[in-house]
């Protein structure tokens, strides 16, 4: 039956080049022939169509549409013939001379095969193979030198990407399509709008992969926009603006944030375009870019704000209020170099380390005044030893600095602290000294810490007796004698007596506190015993009363 229909098939294919009525009747007969075609006769049918088809004739798009009908009717049976069909489509696109109806007819065949050629029960690997067999010839055609083939392949790929089964394509294949379409956009062709349409489809369905090419695509779109202005091609300008707007909407704003300002400037220039639809598209893209810029700036500002109780803050966030006007409890120290903070340098004995660290925001610190007029920070949480003055300041870095990563490979020698305010050498004072952990007092209670801040020169004695005025006066005298060596030499006995008196009074106060606590515990125990005894007596009395009432009740005989 197939052999008898071959001459009829040739005749119907020839009628496609005739008038409209002949073409309609020929298409009706060919559709009927395709529906009744046996699956084994599909290869012969494809060969017959390819031999008799003239791609430069008006019947080219009608002939290609037979492949779409074949895919709809026979479904998975057409999968073995995908290579033959794709070869025919590529040759048709190459000889189409930029005919959009022919390119559109080819673009309908590809998603039809992807939809009807894949059986839902097929394994994932086979589905991926089918998508790759459709995609690979078109992807390679994007790099062709013929403009008609490149634009036609882009249109077919766009239809494939927009199909439901494109989700079975592997990331490697999607990445290859992105690479080739970026290269295709570099050539200033008259039909770059088709390649830009493919870019928008990829950004919609595969945004994570397209983000790797985001900046390159932005620059390419701006360059094409410039070509459209110089050439007077409004279609090219419109497509470029639409692609830029679509990329900003679909991709992560962080991947294109560096190019947002450039996009805003170009879109502002497009507001003077002659075409109203170009101005409208440019205005929409400008609003999108401004919204992205505002959102990212607000997020960055929120990230830069210091959070109460937080021990860290973001990099490159400078304080508006001068740091020297703040109290030591509210100052934020940049514990490492390279940040806007009271710290200007970090003079560790080896300064060749290239490590960068996050800025530290220390809210709760232990402070002790230094002999140079500065404030020494003793941080239990961060281990930072820092000196803050109102002038220029040098602060030693944290022991967290990995000195073993230095380039010279020398060992760490310790922390150096020097005040830049002392520019003249003095025999009584060293310009630099080595700081050790023993030089700092860590107080166990807040009361001792407050006392150390009020009496910074008396750090060796206990601060539990500061509340007593008598002991406070004696302490001040003792401190004065310590400060004045002459008084210490003249009255050594008095100083020792005061010290012993303070020690005895401290011991007496502590003993009285312990005795008072013991008395309170004994009183509480006595009260508890009395309460329990009272409850027991009350219960016992209640039971006795109930028993007596039972005894008083008698049994009397009824008189007869």
Swiss-Prot record:
Keywords of this entry: Acetylation, Membrane, Nucleus, Transmembrane, Transmembrane helix
InterPro entries: ARM-like, ARM-type_fold, TORTIFOLIA1/SINE1-2
SUPFAM superfamilies found in the cross-reference section: ARM repeat (SSF48371)
An example molecular function term from Gene Ontology annotations: microtubule binding
Transmembrane stretches, start-end: 528-548
Keyword Lipid metabolism: no
Residues bearing PTM N-acetylglycine: 2
Any Pfam family hit: TOR1L1_N
Localization of this protein: Nucleus membrane
Tissue spec: Preferentially expressed in guards cells, but also detected in root cells.
Main subcellular localisation: nucleus
Mutant phenotype after disruption: No visible phenotype. Affected nucleus positioning in guard cells.
Assigned GO CC terms: microtubule; nuclear envelope; nuclear membrane
Biological process annotations from GO: nuclear migration
Membrane topology annotation: Single-pass membrane protein
Domain notes: The KASH domain, which contains a transmembrane domain, mediates the nuclear envelope targeting and is involved in the binding to the SUN proteins.
Subunit structure, as described in the record: Interacts with SUN1 and SUN2. Binds to F-actin.
Its biological purpose: Plays a role in nucleus positioning in guard cells.
Listed name of the protein: Protein SINE1
Gene name tied to this protein: SINE1
């Amino acid at each position: 039956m197939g052999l008898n229909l071959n001459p009829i098939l040739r005749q119907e294919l020839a009628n496609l080049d005739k008038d409209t009525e002949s073409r309609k009747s020929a298409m009706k007969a060919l559709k009927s022939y395709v529906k009744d075609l046996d699956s084994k006769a599909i290869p012969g049918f494809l060969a017959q169509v390819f031999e008799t088809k003239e791609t430069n004739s008006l019947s080219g798009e009608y002939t290609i549409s037979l492949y779409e009908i074949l895919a709809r009717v026979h479904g998975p049976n057409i999968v073995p013939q995908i290579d033959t069909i794709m070869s025919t489509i590529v040759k048709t696109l190459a000889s189409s001379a930029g005919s959009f109806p022919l390119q559109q007819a080819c673009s309908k065949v590809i998603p039809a095969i992807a939809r009807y050629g894949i059986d839902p029960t097929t394994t994932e690997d086979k589905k991926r193979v089918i998508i790759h067999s459709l995609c690979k010839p078109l992807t390679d055609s994007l790099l062709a030198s013929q403009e008609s083939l490149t634009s036609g392949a882009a249109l077919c790929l766009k239809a494939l990407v927009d199909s439901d089964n494109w989700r079975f394509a592997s990331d490697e294949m999607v990445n290859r399509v992105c690479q080739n379409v970026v290269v295709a956009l570099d050539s200033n062709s008259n039909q770059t709008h088709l390649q830009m349409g493919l870019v928008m489809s990829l950004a919609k369905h595969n945004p994570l992969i397209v983000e790797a090419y985001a900046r390159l695509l932005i620059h390419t779109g701006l360059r094409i926009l410039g070509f459209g202005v110089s050439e007077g091609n409004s279609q090219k300008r419109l497509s470029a603006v639409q692609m830029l707007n679509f990329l900003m909407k679909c991709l992560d704003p962080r991947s294109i944030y560096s190019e947002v300002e450039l996009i805003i400037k170009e879109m502002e220039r497009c507001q003077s375009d002659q075409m109203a639809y170009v101005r409208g598209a440019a205005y929409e893209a400008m609003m999108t870019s401004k919204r992205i810029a505002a959102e990212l700036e607000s997020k960055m500002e929120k990230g830069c704000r210091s959070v109460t109780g937080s021990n860290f803050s973001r990099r490159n966030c400078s304080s508006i209020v001068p740091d020297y006007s703040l109290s030591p409890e509210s100052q934020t120290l940049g514990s490492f170099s390279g940040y806007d903070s009271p710290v200007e340098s970090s003079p560790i004995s080896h300064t060749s380390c290239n490590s960068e660290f996050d800025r530290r925001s220390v809210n709760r610190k232990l402070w002790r005044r230094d002999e140079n007029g500065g404030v020494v920070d003793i941080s239990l949480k961060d281990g930072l030893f820092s000196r803050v003055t109102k002038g220029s300041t040098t602060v030693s870095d944290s022991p967290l600095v990995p000195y073993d990563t230095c380039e010279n490979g020398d060992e760490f020698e310790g922390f150096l602290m020097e005040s830049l305010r002392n520019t003249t050498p003095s025999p009584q004072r060293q310009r630099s000294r080595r700081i050790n952990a023993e030089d700092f007092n860590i107080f166990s209670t807040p009361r001792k810490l407050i006392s150390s801040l009020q009496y910074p020169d008396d750090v060796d004695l206990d601060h539990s007796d500061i509340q007593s005025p008598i002991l406070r006066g004696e302490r001040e005298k003792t401190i004065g004698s310590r400060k004045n060596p002459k008084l210490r030499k003249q009255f050594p006995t008095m100083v020792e007596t005061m010290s012993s008196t303070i020690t005895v009074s401290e011991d007496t106060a502590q003993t009285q506190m312990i005795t008072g606590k013991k008395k309170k515990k004994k009183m509480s125990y006595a009260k508890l015993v009395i309460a329990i005894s009272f409850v027991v007596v009350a219960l016992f009395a209640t039971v006795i009363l109930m028993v007596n009432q039972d005894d008083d009740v008698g049994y009397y005989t009824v008189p007869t």
